[in-house]
Amino acid sequence: MAVKLGTLLLALALGLAQPASARRKLLVFLLDGFRSDYISDEALESLPGFKEIVSRGVKVDYLTPDFPSLSYPNYYTLMTGRHCEVHQMIGNYMWDPTTNKSFDIGVNKDSLMPLWWNGSEPLWVTLTKAKRKVYMYYWPGCEVEILGVRPTYCLEYKNVPTDINFANAVSDALDSFKSGRADLAAIYHERIDVEGHHYGPASPQRKDALKAVDTVLKYMTKWIQERGLQDRLNVIIFSDHGMTDIFWMDKVIELNKYISLNDLQQVKDRGPVVSLWPAPGKHSEIYNKLSTVEHMTVYEKEAIPSRFYYKKGKFVSPLTLVADEGWFITENREMLPFWMNSTGRREGWQRGWHGYDNELMDMRGIFLAFGPDFKSNFRAAPIRSVDVYNVMCNVVGITPLPNNGSWSRVMCMLKGRASTAPPVWPSHCALALILLFLLA
């Protein structure tokens, strides 16, 4: 009897260790700045590519980003399943007082330092360590050696990828799957975000950018069939955050009107969230003066709301400013981040921005998925950016590292056995093996 029970427990352990999708491939899209209502039911009627994907797969009501609702923090949250204060990528702009090094939205050389990236292990590193082949296209960070590891292939982001770049990346990724060169491919596309910033989330330019993506995705579903990948490939599409309207003409908070900028040791970022390091002896004075400013809140580090999962980050500044939705914080108007428009000079006004309180409706992103492991024509309740990691781990058949995601929020979207697999199964296997040992 003990032998039979032991055999059963061993089979249970091995079964839990092998998700149904263990050898299926995964194609991931990160579409920057894609607000949830861009693919409302009404909008889908003019987006045949997205409409087909929704009918064939899963669409969540919306995805709530991590705070701050900025790009780099959520790039890492999505790929680690951890809050910003855990993975340490707490902003697009960061400063480390100990080393006097800065992270400036990934464009400066010091942004490539392990200092910023080694706080957590992203999925592509875990897969690469497991001898799985990972192809990444324009994905911020794929060019960085993280925890001593680089992906199999990285087409480095240097300029905003064009629509043709995007289409070529999709085609190349599918060819890589067919040839066996890739197990995971991850594609980043930024144009929807760029047009949303420059012209606003409701602008014709942003809508044109979305239609261009829709066209490529429509072709993609056809290309998957042509390459015979429909039973071997899962596709997941998500965004890092949404976008809201801003009004530089009347909703700008200029810090130099309230404090002396000479009393600051360092300032990082402009917009919804600004980090301040007061000069020695100036903390209380600056805090008291900024506490009276309307349309923003100034937080000392320990007073930052716990719901942001932000204040424990090691790069969080002594003072953090958070603007009300639609308001923009800067040192002065001359320091506003104008963009280079058709004049060839940096004088274009920004019309859209993100980074605000992550619970605001306009900050919501998207999550779509289809393939052999996902239910079809299925609408799911809202999820959070920390939840996406467990879904990806499940469908590629790899053990997720400890994370902040909720399995109960995402298991409903998966078919059959995949939906019942726990997000972290080693503890179950360990229990089975311990019982087996005791019965031996």
UniProtKB/Swiss-Prot annotation:
Signal peptide: 1-22
Cofactor stoichiometry and binding remark: Binds 2 Zn(2+) ions per subunit.
Class in the EC hierarchy, top level: hydrolase
Annotated residues for binding of substrate: D32, S71, N92, D193, H241, H354
Record text on activity regulation: Inhibited by EDTA and EGTA in vitro.
Protein location: Cell membrane
Tissues expressed in: Predominantly expressed in kidney and brain. In the kidney, expressed specifically in the proximal tubules and thin descending limbs of Henle (at protein level).
Residues annotated with Phosphoserine modification: S71
Chain residues that bind Zn(2+) 1: D32, S71, D240, H241
Listed transmembrane segments: none
Function: Choline-specific glycerophosphodiesterase that hydrolyzes glycerophosphocholine (GPC) and lysophosphatidylcholine (LPC) and contributes to supplying choline to the cells. Has a preference for LPC with short (12:0 and 14:0) or polyunsaturated (18:2 and 20:4) fatty acids. In vitro, hydrolyzes only choline-containing lysophospholipids, such as sphingosylphosphorylcholine (SPC), platelet-activating factor (PAF) and lysoPAF, but not other lysophospholipids.
Family, per entry: Belongs to the nucleotide pyrophosphatase/phosphodiesterase family.
Name listed for the protein in its UniProt record: Glycerophosphocholine cholinephosphodiesterase ENPP6
Organism: Homo sapiens (Human)
Name of the gene: ENPP6
